[in-house]
Amino acid sequence: MRNNFLLSLVALTLIFTSCANDDTADIVFNITNNNGGGGTSVDTDVFLSGTYTNDLTLDANINYKINGSLVIADGATLTIPAGMTIKALAAGSDVYVAISQGAKIIAEGTANSPIVFTSDASEPKAGDWGGLILLGKAPINSVTGTATSTSEIAGLPYGGNIANDNSGSLKYVRIEYSGGSADGQSENNGLSFYGVGNGTEVDYIQIYEGKDDGVEFFGGTVNVSHVAVMDLQDDSIDWTEGYSGTITDVYIQHIQNPTETFNSDKAFECDGYNDDFGNNSNPVFFSNPTVTNVTIVGVGSDNTFQDGKIINAGQYEAVRLRRGTAAIFSNVQITGFGEAFDVDGNDTSDPTGQAIVDDELQVNNVTFTDVTTKFKNDTGNDTLTEADFISGDGNGTGTDFATWGSGWTK
């Protein structure tokens, strides 16, 4: 019996070694024989990393751990069944999942059986691993036509001229303890969309306790809905590079017991173009998304420090709009911030203020609670007033997170 088991194990190893060589990927089985001489019982962990050029369908009966960069190449599809928990080694920025241009991810959980990406640490924390990266062929404003840019993490191409590009489907997916830092500038987000098109389906997503941003859009046209971002140490939602999709039903909750080193930044950081790496000082067009049904929960409008700890982080803006971005926000609730909307830039390269004048940057139906400043005008255009930017003050109801977030979020 023991010899038969060992022969089977050798055969299994050879099969997966062959697959690994074909796909230029690493598949490692840790198999423990627990039969005690009285039968066969096999406990299996499958470690995943490398580049997959063929489809990869995960088995719900196997424990998967990501131990490096897992890249799904052009033409391949990663399929993850509902209810799976996929753990990543707590090794920081080098552990991530990337869906390349031309590849797809099909990760469709349910409210009762969400798909979870998390850390394998016994005491998990923000930044344990990288995150999930999707790269598509939709337009970005740093290049024209079919030209591409290169992603901050993984160094993969993104962008193009296919607005309805399809990178797959994400439904009822929770991403925990992401945001591992590569260096002083390059950090993983929980969920990064690089030039992702609106043929991609994204609905019911939670980012929980990440070290960097929760969700970031680098151009593209992808539409997302039912997004919960909670207890992030940086911004909750970012956009840049000409993002022009829709963001519908958003719940953002900042760290409720912050310290000087453990606190949230902005709920939304919104850029018309990306100059973080000097790659786009002359954008082809500016970001212009539509954001609807939003609830943002801060920790109070006061700005008080005591014994080196932030008692209330009201110095942070809820929403920062800059670098020429346009956007229409509708039905918004903001609670507990020193500033609600901070708008920067009004010169030729940063025409954010002009977007207000042109009615392309507006907030419609919003309710402020415990907010000191509703509209901070840093555009350089002193003629702009709160009334030019905000309408329907007191009419915002936000999103019904208690209903749509029930059962699958933390």
Show the residue positions of the predicted features.
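Extracellular beta-rich repeat passengers
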Residues: A25-A73, T77-L78, L89-G102, G109, ...
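Positively charged n-region of N-terminal signal peptides that target proteins for export
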Residues: M1-F5
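Sec-dependent N-terminal signal peptides
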Residues: L6-T13
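C-terminal motif of bacterial Sec signal peptides marking the signal peptidase cleavage site
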Residues: I15-S18
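Bacterial signal peptide processing site
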Residues: A20-D23
